[in-house]
Amino acid sequence: MEIVIEWRSLSDRKVIDPASHLSEWIENNPGCKIYIGCDSSNLGPSTTFATVIVLHKENKGGHVIYNRISESRIKSRYERLWREVELSVSAAHLLASWGFGKPDYIDIDLNPDPKYQSNTLLSSAVGMVESMGIKPRWKSKSPWAISVADSICR
């Protein structure tokens, strides 16, 4: 069974065709930066993931498209955080398949401070993202896409 993922515009929450939507926005806003990120939350029997593509126009704001998927609850924090990285990387592959090349950044919801559990995944996640030729950003490096994804998945 194939999972159908609906992409939506954050501004009006309407379902969109992501490739044509991004193409039109980028054409009207040349020079914009593209960031990708994912966040998740557990509620009841499900884990909900929100993956976002942020189009940022320097000093002019931006635009966000996103999708939300729910899976059976992932109890392991490590597995859930790693799934966030996987979904961000998948979105980067989609972006390339739509003809937009690589994003400027993939923002990952991991902390460089060893006192946080997510720290143990940071080097692996950074390696995965960098192996694709994409720059990663994490908690101390202003990961905008994660902030947006956090508000969507809740």
Language-model features: locations:
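A short acidic (Asp/Glu
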Residues: 45-49, 114-121, 148-149
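Short, low-complexity, polybasic intrinsically disordered segments
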Residues: 112-142
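Basic, amphipathic N-terminal segments that precede the first structured/catalytic domain
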Residues: 1-35
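Acidic helix/loop or adjacent segment enriched in Glu/Asp that either coordinates divalent metal
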Residues: 71-99
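Acidic, metal-ligating active-site segments
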Residues: 36-37, 41-65
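C-terminal edge-of-domain segments
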Residues: 41, 48-50, 136-137, 141-154
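N-terminal targeting/trafficking signals and adjacent low-complexity tails
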Residues: 1-6, 10, 115-117, 130-132, ...
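Short glycine-rich phosphate-binding loop at a beta-alpha junction
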Residues: 103-110
